[in-house]
């Protein structure tokens, strides 16, 4: 997963791994020293992200080397009980790269054990939206975290975290992944490539910094598509800005075109994931003869007493009518995820195209 090219390094991009036979993303090695460090002055950190993922390698290992901290690298299949034992045994003080689904599993397991979690001072998450209920539970279980909880947004091509939110901003705007990190420029562009300066206007997120990749290894065509002449990276993510904070709407490839309306799945997923009794959710677009696409919600429930009608009413109270899913599916098992912890929506879409339904 890692190779050196002169003074640079290559990291395999998980999305391109599936689609393009392991194309590498070359990232400038010098930029890693500029990364904000979750573990400075914290003696022992926990790393659960895979080392072939940018958060594991760059934000985890390399950052720890520069900071001179002790890092416990978790091995093997993710097991919430083992994670809790590691925190207790090694008196872990910081945990960075906590994917929401993994963090939730750990928090669900914590009350079942008589272990000491008071050493934990800092928790940093990412990889997916962080529900407000999960933020509150993290501070409840890890009592000494308080204001030292945060999460951010980034991607392999950007070299790790691009924007980050914690402290007062997180308390006031928990749905935002935050403000740009030092040395990082973020802008929004419309479909014609023009920069958007107004607040609360949707556009594609573009990033420029020393940590942005040099290009896709030995693939100039794709590199030119992703990097413009000013070295701004087109992320493929849609979002908007408000009071200097950025909000992520959806991946460009996830956007659902329902009739003449744009539907951003992440907006719906955040609401569903916050509903008591919903373990996780995914929203996808499925073909529709009249509308082009229809909105479908796939949910994993903790409580089988919850009905789709109940969830639909809840969403109608919080969303525009055209964003409320008209199709629902319940799964008994966890949603399919890649090694980075992200839901593999292409699998769910393929199952829907084949009229596959796991649970009635």
Name every feature range the model reports, one short phrase each.
Residues 127, 154, 178, 237, ...:
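Active-site glycine-centered loops adjacent to acidic/histidine catalytic or metal-binding residues
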Residues 69, 89-98, 107-172, 185, ...:
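Gly/Ser/Thr-rich phosphate-binding loop
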Residues 350-360:
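Acidic/polar alpha-helix N-cap and adjacent early helical turns
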Residues 168, 179-183, 194-226, 263:
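Conserved ATP/PPi-binding loop(s) of AMP-dependent carboxylate-activating enzymes
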Residues 98, 149-157, 177-180, 284-287, ...:
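Beta-strand->loop->alpha-helix junctions that form or flank phosphate-binding loops
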Residues 85-88, 95, 209-210, 214-215, ...:
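AMP-binding/adenylate-forming catalytic core of the ANL superfamily
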């Amino acid at each position: 997963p890692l190779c050196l090219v002169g003074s640079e390094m290559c990291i395999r991009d998980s999305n391109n791994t599936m689609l393009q036979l392991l194309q590498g993303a070359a990232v400038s090695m010098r930029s890693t020293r500029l990364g904000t460090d979750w573990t400075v002055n914290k003696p022992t950190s926990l790393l659960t992200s895979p080392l072939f993922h940018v958060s594991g390698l760059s934000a985890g290992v390399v950052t720890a080397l520069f900071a001179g901290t002790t890092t416990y690298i978790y091995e093997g299949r993710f097991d919430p009980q083992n994670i809790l034992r590691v925190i207790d045994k090694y008196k872990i003080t910081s945990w960075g790269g906590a994917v929401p689904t993994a963090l939730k599993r750990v928090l669900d397991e914590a009350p079942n054990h008589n272990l000491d979690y008071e050493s934990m001072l800092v928790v940093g998450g990412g990889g997916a939206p962080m529900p407000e209920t999960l933020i509150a539970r993290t501070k409840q279980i890890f009592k000494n975290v308080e204001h030292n909880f945060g999460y951010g947004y980034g991607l392999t091509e950007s070299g790790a975290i691009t924007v980050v939110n914690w402290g007062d901003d997180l308390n006031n705007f928990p749905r935002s992944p935050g403000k740009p990190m030092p040395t990082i420029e973020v802008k929004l562009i419309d479909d014609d490539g023009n920069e958007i300066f107004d607040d609360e206007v949707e556009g594609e997120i573009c990033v420029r910094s020393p940590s942005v990749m040099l290009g896709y290894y030995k693939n100039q065509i794709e590199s030119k598509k992703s990097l413009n002449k000013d070295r701004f990276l087109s992320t493929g993510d849609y979002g908007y800005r408000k009071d200097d904070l950025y909000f992520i709407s959806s991946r460009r490839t996830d956007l659902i075109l329902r009739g003449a309306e744009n539907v951003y799945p992440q907006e719906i997923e955040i609401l569903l994931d916050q509903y008591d009794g919903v373990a996780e959710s995914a929203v996808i677009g499925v073909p529709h003869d009249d509308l082009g696409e229809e909105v479908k919600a796939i949910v994993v429930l903790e409580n089988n007493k919850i009905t789709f009608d109940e969830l639909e009413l809840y969403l109608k109270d919080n969303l525009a009518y055209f964003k409320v899913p008209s199709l629902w599916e319940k799964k008994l098992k966890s949603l399919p995820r890649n090694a980075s912890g992200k839901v593999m929506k292409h699998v769910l879409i393929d199952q829907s195209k084949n009229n596959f339904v796991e649970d009635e």
